[in-house]
């Protein structure tokens, strides 16, 4: 190895117990090694009729003198030469065409071998980037089919030739066959521009895989794939929502598949006669024994710390003033009942929908609150479609039933007296959730017209 280069000292030692005359010699070891170069590999994307210059630099080599270089495109020799005092060699292409796209290799050679720089020069367009925060993407809701508003931006649209079209591929989840069509593009795509295409005649409630490939005069660019799913719109233009859990589908609330057990719909009139005493409500929030509510049953076999999570439907919202300092405010309120000596914890989360799902702690309360219904009010400021999650955590014993009722969402902030009294009287912790969207690209995306 080249690290072994250097001066070595050799000395005599005793021979069969006899002293010998001390002698020593110095030996210099010189290890020759081929040139180390950079870049080892570099991709260059450039449009036709444009120029490009590639540069291969020597980092170290031994011997450093009498270095030669060769530039090749594939197997075709382009240029050879010898280094003088410079530490790099360049190869320019004045005007790119189909004939001079490809892999360029620069070999720098000495007596010990060669180092190589490789350059992939291509006219391929970069992959598009799907936009996952489309407001109300299920824009048509017919009986058996639905339509989906697909949106995306183009990464570095000016890096190569103008994108003239996109090849759209779509297939139903679980199927093998792709259906393809071309989406024509008129004019130049600007960086950050939001492009929209409506997918129609999609079968409810099937999910679909979508593939998008940009096309230029060079040919196909890089593809990107996403999955779209049908979700029944609830209050697509959210103004007010109220759920007392009286209807059969419990207002489209659903159980979380990742928890330990489920919430249960119940009324006092229909509950099991073997219910655990000294815990749980005696009536719904209105005082009716026939009225329903949702609760967690903490009797055996439930264990301390186990969780039950109840998910609200997805609410779609549209920012009213994307240039303003705030998002639209909503007042989220609900009634909760936490009575029993073994009460655990009731948490509420705000889940924002997007490319990555984010859950923000919104409200929390724990411990025995007495045999009564309590009310909570919290301001929320969602920036995109959202869900609310009720999480009940089992306490140390069976007398730990937790119930909720009359969940409401109304546009506008909660009254100050509600926030001041309802959230503090029982020791609950209310958290105002302010989530701001900083990147200017999102503001541009929201305002960009559909193509």
Swiss-Prot record:
A lipid is attached at residue 426 (GPI-anchor amidated aspartate). Its main location: membrane. The keyword Chaperone does not apply. It comes from the Eukaryota. Disulfide bonds join 56-106. Pfam families: MAM (PF00629). It is a lipid-anchor; GPI-anchor. Residues 35-122 form the Ig-like domain. Gene3D superfamilies: 2.60.120.200, Immunoglobulins. PROSITE patterns: FN3, IG_LIKE, MAM_2. May be involved in cell-cell interactions. This is MAM domain-containing glycosylphosphatidylinositol anchor protein 2. It comes from Macaca fascicularis (Crab-eating macaque). The gene is MDGA2.
């Amino acid at each position: 190895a080249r690290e072994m280069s250097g001066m070595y000292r050799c000395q005599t030692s005793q021979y069969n117990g006899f002293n010998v005359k001390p002698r020593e010699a110095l030996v210099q070891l010189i290890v020759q090694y081929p040139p180390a170069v950079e870049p080892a590999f570099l991709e260059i994307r450039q449009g036709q009729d444009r120029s490009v210059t590639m540069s291969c630099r020597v980092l170290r080599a031994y011997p450093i003198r009498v270095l030669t270089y060769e530039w090749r495109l594939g197997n075709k020799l382009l240029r050879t030469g010898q280094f003088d005092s410079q530490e790099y060699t360049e190869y320019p292409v004045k005007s790119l065409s189909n004939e001079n796209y490809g892999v360029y290799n620069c070999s720098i050679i000495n007596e010990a071998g060669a180092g190589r720089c490789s350059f992939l020069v291509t006219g391929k367009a970069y992959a598009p980037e799907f936009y996952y925060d489309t407001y109300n993407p299920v824009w048509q809701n017919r009986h058996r089919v639905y339509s989906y508003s697909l949106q995306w931006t183009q990464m570095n649209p000016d890096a190569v030739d103008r994108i003239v079209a996109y090849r759209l591929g779509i297939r139903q989840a679980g199927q093998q066959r792709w259906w393809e069509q071309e989406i024509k593009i008129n004019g130049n795509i600007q960086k950050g521009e939001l492009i929209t295409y409506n997918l129609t005649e999609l079968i409810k409630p099937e999910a679909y895989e979508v593939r998008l490939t940009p096309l230029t005069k060079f040919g196909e660019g890089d593809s990107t794939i996403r999955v779209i799913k049908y979700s029944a719109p609830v209050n697509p233009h959210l103004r007010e929502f109220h759920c007392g859990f009286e209807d059969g589908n419990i207002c489209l609330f659903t159980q979380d598949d990742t928890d330990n057990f489920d919430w249960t719909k119940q009324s006092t009139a229909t509950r099991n006669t073997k219910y655990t005493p000294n815990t749980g409500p005696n009536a719904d929030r209105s005082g009716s024994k026939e009225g329903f509510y949702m609760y967690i049953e903490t009797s055996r076999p439930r264990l301390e710390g186990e969780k039950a999570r109840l998910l609200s439907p997805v609410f779609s919202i549209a920012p009213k003033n994307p240039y303003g300092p705030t998002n639209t405010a909503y007042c989220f309120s609900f009634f909760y009942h936490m009575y029993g000596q073994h009460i655990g914890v009731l948490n509420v989360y705000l889940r924002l929908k997007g490319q990555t799902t984010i859950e923000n702690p919104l409200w929390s309360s724990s411990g025995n609150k007495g045999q009564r219904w309590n009310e909570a009010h919290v301001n929320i400021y969602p920036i995109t479609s959202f869900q609310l999650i009720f999480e009940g955590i089992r306490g140390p014993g069976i007398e730990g039933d937790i119930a909720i009722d009359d969940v409401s969402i109304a546009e506008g902030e909660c009254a100050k007296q509600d926030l001041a009294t309802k959230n503090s009287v029982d020791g609950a912790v209310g958290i105002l959730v302010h989530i701001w969207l900083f990147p200017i690209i999102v503001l541009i995306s929201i305002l960009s017209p559909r193509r």
